[in-house]
Amino acid sequence: MAVPKRKTSPSKRGMRRSADALKAPTYVEDKNSGELRRPHHIDLKTGMYRGRQVLTPKESA
């Protein structure tokens, strides 16, 4: 069975655990519609991605 050679210091343990925290998702304001969207994702209202029309927008009922 693997056994650590040295005791892990509280600093090292904390640095390892710092990546476990949940981070709030980031949003950017869309230049065309002004709505918030995730970066590197398609704007579902307009169907635009990086200045190109990639989806046909749904008709609002």
Curated annotation (Swiss-Prot):
Q: Which UniProt keywords apply?
A: Ribonucleoprotein, Ribosomal protein
Superkingdom, natural source: Bacteria
Membrane-spanning residues: none
Name a single GO biological process: translation
**Keyword Ribosomal protein (UniProt):** yes
Instruction: Mark out the compositionally biased spans (Basic residues).
Output: 1-16
Task: Provide GO CC annotations from the record.
Answer: large ribosomal subunit
A Gene Ontology molecular function term for this protein is: structural constituent of ribosome
**Which SUPFAM superfamilies does this one have?**
Zn-binding ribosomal proteins
Q: Where is this region: Disordered?
A: 1-61
InterPro entries named in the record: Ribosomal_bL32, Ribosomal_bL32_bact, Ribosomal_zn-bd
Task: Give the signal peptide, or none.
Answer: none
Bias (Basic and acidic residues) ranges: 28-44
> What family classification does the UniProt entry report for this protein?
Belongs to the bacterial ribosomal protein bL32 family.
According to UniProt, the name of this protein is Large ribosomal subunit protein bL32
Q: What is the lineage of its organism?
A: Bacteria, Pseudomonadati, Pseudomonadota, Alphaproteobacteria, Hyphomicrobiales
Designated gene of the protein? rpmF
